[in-house]
């Protein structure tokens, strides 16, 4: 089913290539500060305040073989299946802490919304 979805996504001109989370993690220097599209399941959702002082969320995006951290202003729920489009950063200094393998989401689409768009 996931492979079928990836094929549909790749055949749609408006959507960039969907990457495996493990591909991004395995080649962080290649994707650093570039826009990526990844999909997976949302977990460990936490409300935060972003750099501009706005309410936001951080969560983990998991696929079958890897996990990325995502920062977003779009609310998500634990267990959601989503497509995330955003800018990947392999290392960001957050005060005293270094944050690795993070996507700053620009767009988050629920997979069920994508299927509805295909049908409708």
Model-flagged regions — what are they?
Residues 13-120:
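OB-fold and OB-like single-stranded nucleic-acid-recognition modules
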